[in-house]
Structures are given as C-alpha cells and as structure tokens.
C-alpha cells in the first residue's frame, strides 16, 4: 500500500461505493476549514501578483516566518518534493527513515544516491543533503531544534542543504524550524491540506534562505497556484481563532481514537493528533477484516505488525470503528 487517502484499491478488492467507506487511511483533518464563498472572477481570471502576495503574507504570519527568510507557494508540497532534487547541486542525500517515501523516490529519480539513516545516527561523510520529516510520518517522532541545528551546521560545512518536511507541524507550532532558516541552510516545507482538511485544494509552501526560495519560484513559474487555492488559503491562514480551536479539537479526537484502539488490543507505536500508529501481531488480518466492513486504514509493506488510523470525522464514525474492532 503506497499511500493513504485513495479508496480505489479498497473498492477494487472489497467493493462498495465511496460513500459506503469509512476512510481512515490518511492523516488529514476530517473536519475541514469551511470554504468561503468565492466570486466568479476567482475561477475565470488568471491569478494576479497581488493575489499571490496576499496569500504569502498570510502564510508568513501563520508560520511565523522571520525577516530575511523568504517563502514560496506551490500546488502542494509534493510539487516541491519533486523539484528540490532537480534544483540542488550534485551531491548525495541521507533520509531520516522510515518516513514518507516520496522524498527518497524523488531524489533517486533525479539520479542521486539515497542513504536511509536513523534519527540517532551520525550523518555519513560524503552526504551533502539531509531530509527530515518533522513530526515524522508515520511514527510522529519529533526532532528538537538542538538536533536540527547540529545537523544543519554539519551540512553547512559541505555547502549543502537540510530539507525539513513539516506537513504535520501545524498541530504544534513550537515544533517548527522556520526560525532556524535565518542562519542555517534549511528549507522547510509546509503542507496546507492536512491541518486544514483541504488536501484536494493542492497548496503548500517552501520557507528558507532567499537564494533557495528564488530558485524554487523561478522553477515553478509565474502561476504557482490556482485562483481558488490562493483565495481559500489566504482566508484559512488568516483565521487564527479557527486554527487554535482546531488544535484543541484534534487532540480530543485523537485521545478518543486511542481509547477505541486500546480496547481492541492495539498498542500505540506513535503518531500525531491527526493519526495514530499502532502495533498488533495480527495487523494484516485486522486490516483485511476492517476492509471487509468497508473501513480502510493504512498498512505498511515494510512492517506487517503496524497500522495507521486517521481520525474518524464524528462520533458515529468512531462508534462504527469500535463496533467493527469489537467483532474481530
């Protein structure tokens, strides 16, 4: 199972229409930001530079981007993940693993040697680039600022770059390494769709030293995002009250999910407030039994005792999961 959030495989194997499924396979807020009413011209005209500037201004405030650090928008962080290896000077990359697989895949596709390392490992000699997902997906591991600074200083001596994927950092802004970009060779990727529950909008950001952000902006071109994405993103990122309330709501929902999973015999192995990673010696059988009841969670080809569950959207969905688990 390569990624969560796509019911195509589930329906092909187990049938059922999309509405019949409870999709818990992705770490995306199931209660999204309420879409604002958009004027018709947002859909009809090309996005203006003023529209883009307004979005980036909102993002700078939301992500606490300091002066002297730049920011660029793109159609989701996946676009940025694909571009970074092509914009980087020659050199090999270390990926703190296991983690989101598209980072290593993008660098390998660009012809780079990719080395998987553990969070506790020293960076190998000969490495010019390091990729860290923080908080990590799927285990939620957090690397503190001291560790990130140590790695970035090591890489600075090699004229390289540390790329920090903060797709889940909205859950706790104190985790973010954005402030470190002012003095260290770091590019931070921020995902809009996960925390705001609007993954289909395709919006993400790169934050870092001006030289790198200019390189990214030039590669992406003059219209990096659609007009609707600019408008919705600006509204959501400016809504600080919604973000604060959502953090509290997600924490409460995650604890409720913990209770259900623990009662079914799963041991927590990690996660964030948007997903839980759990361990069970019969995890693959559990995955199959749930799928037969049209409940889809995330399994992993590299670990047959792990499953990841996203948050159920409401009490009825949580109860549905609890009933299905109790029958196993």
Question: Where are these predicted regions, by residue range?
Answer:
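Active-site phosphate-binding strand-loop segment of PLP-dependent enzymes
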Residues: 115-172
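Conserved PLP-anchoring active-site segment centered on the Schiff-base-forming lysine
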Residues: 85-108, 113-116, 120
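Conserved beta-loop-alpha segment that forms the PLP phosphate-binding cup at the N-terminus of a helix
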Residues: 53, 68-93
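Conserved PLP-binding catalytic core of the aspartate aminotransferase-like
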Residues: 251, 261-293, 311
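PLP-dependent enzyme catalytic core of the Aspartate aminotransferase-like
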Residues: 146, 302-328
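Short, conserved charged micro-motifs
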Residues: 35, 122, 282-289, 316-320
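PLP-dependent aminotransferase class I/II
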Residues: 185-269
């Amino acid at each position: 199972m390569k990624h969560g959030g796509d019911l195509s495989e589930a329906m092909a194997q187990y049938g059922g229409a999309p509405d019949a499924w409870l999709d818990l396979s992705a770490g995306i807020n199931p209660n999204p930001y309420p879409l604002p009413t958009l004027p018709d011209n947002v859909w009809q005209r090309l996005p203006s530079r003023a529209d883009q500037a307004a979005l980036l201004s909102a993002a700078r405030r939301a992500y606490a981007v300091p002066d002297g650090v730049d920011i660029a928008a793109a159609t989701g962080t996946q676009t940025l993940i694909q571009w970074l290896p092509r914009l980087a000077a020659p050199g090999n990359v270390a990926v703190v693993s296991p983690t989101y697989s598209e980072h290593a895949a993008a660098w390998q596709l660009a012809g780079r040697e990719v080395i998987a390392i553990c969070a506790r490992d020293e960076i190998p000699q000969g490495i010019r680039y390091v990729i860290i997902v923080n908080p990590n997906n799927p285990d939620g591991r957090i690397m503190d600022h001291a560790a990130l600074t140590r790695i970035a200083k090591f890489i600075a001596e090699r004229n390289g770059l540390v790329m920090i994927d903060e797709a889940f950092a909205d859950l706790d802004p104190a985790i973010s390494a954005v402030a470190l970009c002012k003095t260290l060779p770091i590019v931070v990727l921020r995902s809009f769709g996960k925390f705001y529950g609007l993954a289909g909008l395709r919006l993400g950001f790169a934050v870092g030293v001006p030289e790198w952000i200019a390189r990214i902006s030039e590669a992406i071109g003059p219209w990096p995002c659609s007009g609707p994405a600019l408008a919705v993103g600006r509204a959501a990122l400016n809504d600080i009250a919604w973000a604060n309330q959502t953090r509290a709501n997600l924490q409460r929902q995650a604890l409720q999910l913990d209770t259900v999973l623990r009662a079914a015999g799963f041991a927590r192995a990690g996660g964030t407030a948007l997903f839980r990673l759990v361990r069970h010696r019969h995890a693959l059988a559990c995955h199959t039994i749930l799928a037969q009841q049209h409940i889809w969670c995330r399994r992993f080809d590299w670990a047959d005792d792990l499953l990841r569950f996203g948050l159920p959207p409401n009490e009825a969905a949580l109860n549905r999961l609890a009933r299905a688990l109790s029958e196993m």
